[in-house]
Each structure stands twice: as C-alpha cells, then as structure tokens.
C-alpha cells in the first residue's frame, strides 16, 4: 500500500540531497540505491533522514566492500541489501543477502524469505523471542538462499578486498585516460568515498541524442560496448524512472538532463590494465571526433 516518491539525481550520479530534504515529509522510508557504486554524502543524508524520522534502507548492489569515511556501505541505514547476481562484487548467478541489527526487522525478513516455522534453525538470525510477534502475521514468499549458492559465495567473500582493489586499479586507468577529452564530463568522487569501481560512468552532458548514438556506434565498431541511460526505451540494465509505468512520477527535469547524458561501461577483472588503457583511448578518440564534427 505504499506510495513511491522519487528523488532526483545530481551530476555526480548520487541522490540530490536538496530534493530529498524538500520531500522528506512525504515518506517514512528511503530506499537508497548506490547506483553503479556512487555513494552520496552519507553523513548529510542520515542527518536529513533522522530529523524527518525516515528509516533508511541501503541498496548496496554495486557498493559491497565500499565505504563512506570509515563506515562500510550498508551500515548507515537500518538494513543493507547486497546482490550476488552476475556482474556483482560476489557472484553466485542470482540471489543476494541482507544485514541488519534490528531483531524484529530481521525476524520478518527471515520468515518472508521462506523459513516457514523453521526459523529457529537460522544460525545467523536474531534470538527466538524476536519471531514470536511476527511469525503468524508475516507471509512466506520463498526467497531463500540455498546452500549451493552460499558455498559458491563464501570463498569469494574472503577475496573481496583484493578484488575491490583490482577493480579500482582498472577504474583509475580509464579515468586518467579520459581526463582531457573535450565534451566529456568525468564524475568527481569525494575524498570520503572509499568506492569500489566495478564499472565506469561519464557524461556527455547536453549532447544531442544523435551525437551520443554516433559515439556509441563508433566505439562498438572498435570493440568497446557502452550503455546509454538516455535512450528513449530501456535497454538491458539501463532503465529510467519514466520507463517504470508501474510507478508513476511527476517529471524531474534536472534529473532528466543528467540521465540523458549518462554513459555506462562495465570494468570486468578479465580486462588487464593495458586493456583498460586501450578502451579509454578508443572512447577518447571517438568522443573527440564526434565533438569536433558537431
């Protein structure tokens, strides 16, 4: 029965805190998505939400292993949600996991996941007393993680810190390679953000749609596949709020301007640092060529 209220995005690809503060009296819960690994000023966000009595749930699908300051992503809000789907920081093909310090919320989550009345066997769950008030009023939606996926994931968790460092090495090579490209806007990252960059984004801000399509086609012809959030129809994983007909929203022109210019690229660990330098060089050449033609 909840009603969704969308909050805008800034040109550094994080939640617009001014817009959040303006809409703070319209909601009780903030589902905060650290999309593509970009973390906002979490100190300011939590101050806004605490003042308004808003519960924060963090979608950390792209920030597992990252930090804001000294706090791991997912530990600011009441709950952190992590994806284990393909291309995420740990990969079991599908599924995910939650972390939470609130016994009642976690008890509800365990029963929702499909524990039936076997919740007492959950070795990471809260005390058994936490289930008494919720066990008969919480439906079972069968979203359990099976032991096979858990066995696939546990060794990856031990390697997470090293994997995060390897992704960031690749990010910095690409970022440096795009540092002086006319018409291309890089994303500024604050010092407090200890990010994990398993993907790379840049902006072709205020470019005509046809020019952006031309850059994508030029790069693809040379083996570099880029994704564009500004396409009128959703493609692959790149959808926008105005595509979600199940969740209507009023227009957000400031966010629309940013979304129109976002270009997105995965940084797989199968790429060597030399590969990343080559990719950056191709993007730089094709963006510069299109910019000069326009």
Language-model features, listed with the residues they occupy:
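Active-site region of PLP-dependent enzymes
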Residues: 63-69, 76-199
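Conserved PLP-binding active-site segment of the aspartate aminotransferase-like
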Residues: 190, 197-208, 237-249, 259-273
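Active-site phosphate-binding strand-loop segment of PLP-dependent enzymes
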Residues: 11-92, 97-99, 103-105, 264
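Conserved PLP cofactor-binding pocket of PLP-dependent enzymes
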Residues: 117-129, 173-176, 214-263, 293-294
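Alpha-helical structural signal in soluble globular domains
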Residues: 23, 44-52, 173-180, 218, ...
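Short beta-strand segments
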Residues: 31-33, 83, 152, 188, ...
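Aromatic/hydrophobic pocket-lining residues that form π-stacking "cages" and hydrophobic walls in ligand
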Residues: 45, 109, 215
């Amino acid at each position: 029965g909840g009603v969704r209220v969308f909050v805008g995005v800034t040109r550094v690809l994080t939640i617009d805190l001014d817009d959040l503060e303006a809409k703070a009296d319209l909601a009780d819960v903030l589902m905060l998505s650290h999309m593509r690994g970009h973390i906002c000023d979490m100190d300011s966000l939590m101050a806004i939400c605490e003042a308004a009595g808003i519960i924060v749930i963090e979608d950390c699908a792209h920030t597992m292993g990252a930090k804001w300051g000294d706090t791991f992503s997912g530990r600011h809000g009441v709950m952190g949600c992590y994806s284990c789907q393909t291309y995420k920081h740990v990969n079991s093909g599908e599924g995910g996991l939650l972390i939470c310090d609130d016994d009642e919320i976690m008890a509800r989550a365990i029963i929702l996941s499909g524990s039936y009345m076997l919740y007492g066997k959950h070795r990471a769950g809260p005390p058994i007393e936490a289930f008494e008030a919720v066990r008969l009023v919480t439906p079972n939606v069968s979203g359990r993680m099976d032991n096979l996926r858990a066995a696939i994931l546990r060794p990856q968790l031990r390697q997470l810190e090293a994997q995060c460092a390897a992704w960031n090495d690749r990010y910095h090579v690409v970022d440096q390679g795009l540092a002086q490209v006319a018409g291309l806007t890089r994303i500024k990252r604050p010092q407090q953000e200890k990010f994990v960059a398993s993907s790379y984004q840049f902006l072709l801000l205020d470019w005509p749609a046809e020019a952006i399509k031309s850059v994508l086609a030029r790069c693809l012809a040379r083996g570099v596949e880029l994704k564009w959030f500004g396409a009128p129809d959703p493609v692959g994983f790149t959808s926008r709020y105005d595509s979600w007909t199940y969740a209507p929203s009023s227009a957000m022109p400031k966010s629309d301007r940013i979304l129109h210019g976002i270009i997105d690229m995965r940084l797989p660990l199968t790429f060597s640092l030399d590969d990343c330098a080559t990719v950056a060089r191709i993007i730089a050449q094709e963006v510069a060529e299109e910019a000069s033609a326009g």
